[in-house]
């Protein structure tokens, strides 16, 4: 029954069923919905392998020493992660620098060193207690280093495309020369109809510098020799492979190298000379005659052995004939004896059981005899006691009668 204090409150519907929940889903079930699968071609689905990403960034640490990402206001500038104009490979990555990255790194380091030396020259005064490597000397050495770096002719040879083609300078140089030749041809073709004579100006001249690389030639020659040696080794390995025992041509071809195998083959070819073949044929004829004689002798020996075995088998059959006639009777007797033995075994078992029963009965009789003797003795004693009691009673009765 409802509490009466809520009976007269306004806004309470009377004579209507109570409703405790709405048609909406509960709050926990409202969050469950099926996400739409994006099937648009404009959306790029990127498949990320978490295991590969974990292996790539495993054991990697971000150095936060001396970094400050706070928004505090101060005189000093808050430094975050430093970034440069070029990509620098870290130490211990196991990745070899390309010529482009190496050139950019050296140029960048030389520029940084030049800036630092200029700052030192403007701030530090020369004195007698300076170190051996003074800023002035360091600036001179730095200028020489920069001159050597520029003297590599990389940007001069490859032009503005050095950052792109520095990984293959030879190919880039060839492409650059071809482009300049095409440009020269086109400029000559266009200016040929207008110029009437005289020497061309200096600006139309193209000067090429050819740099010979004997080390590269030696390296390519050594690579060709190594490739030839590799192919020769494979050929030798193929020639001296495992021999086939069934192939008579490959018998004896077990040379350690290609030259020895060729010499063995040459010896086999020389053995096929006509004079040598006649001698071999004569020897083969004599060997063939001996083989025929051995085959005949072997046939006669085999025939004698066969006759001996047949004679022994006939004698065995002759001895077996009388035994075969008596075999059915012998089998019948054996069956009868088997039955008799089974009956005798059963009779023996019965006798054993009877003997055991007789022994049990004898022991029971002995026990009963002993018990009977005890009962008789007890009865005699009891009878004597009863007789004595009756005698005493009679004596008392007689005394009472007097």
Swiss-Prot record:
| Disordered: annotated segments | 1-24, 185-205
Positions of post-translational Phosphothreonine modification: 134, 199
Q: Name one Pfam family in it.
A: Dynamitin
Q: Which InterPro entries match?
A: Dynamitin
Q: Which residues form a coiled coil?
A: 100-130, 215-247
Give the location in the cell: Cytoplasm, Cytoskeleton, Microtubule organizing center, Centrosome; Membrane; Cytoplasm, Cytoskeleton
Q: What is this protein called?
A: Dynactin subunit 2
